[in-house]
């Protein structure tokens, strides 16, 4: 097995986020484009996330520097606090409190997810700022990474991929059951 030295940029594309103007209510909606904030991850008890507290509209997306990231993107909060991690369960955008990683297809989401979880102390150590620590996009891209050979990576993804899929399905079922419980419980009490 031959591993090589690299950086997060070798694992995927680092993408920042943006906040559409809060003074423009037409930029926000309930059922629009998923827009995730670190606060959303602070209350997310799952490995996967599909929506946050607010969604944005096409107009909000167009009038900000937010970009849509694909399902499987590993969301990483880069400030306030550093290190909340979740996997996009569908297409999402984020606010500027993220430096997310869109995994290269040959690397895969599971490897990037576990890499970021394990690299958190290193990433925190690279953060800068006097009042609040923050990880910049260029710093995130330069975080050192050991990258396994393609055979090892393929075996890892072959093992983890189905587990991640099953976990995502179970998390969705739990959320559906919780919503059903929450709608039925008041009816039972009345």
Predicted regions mapped to residue ranges:
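Non-catalytic DNA-recognition/assembly elements of restriction-modification systems
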Residues: 1-19, 142, 146, 150-190
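DNA target-recognition domains and sequence-specific DNA-contacting regions of bacterial/archaeal
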Residues: 4-148
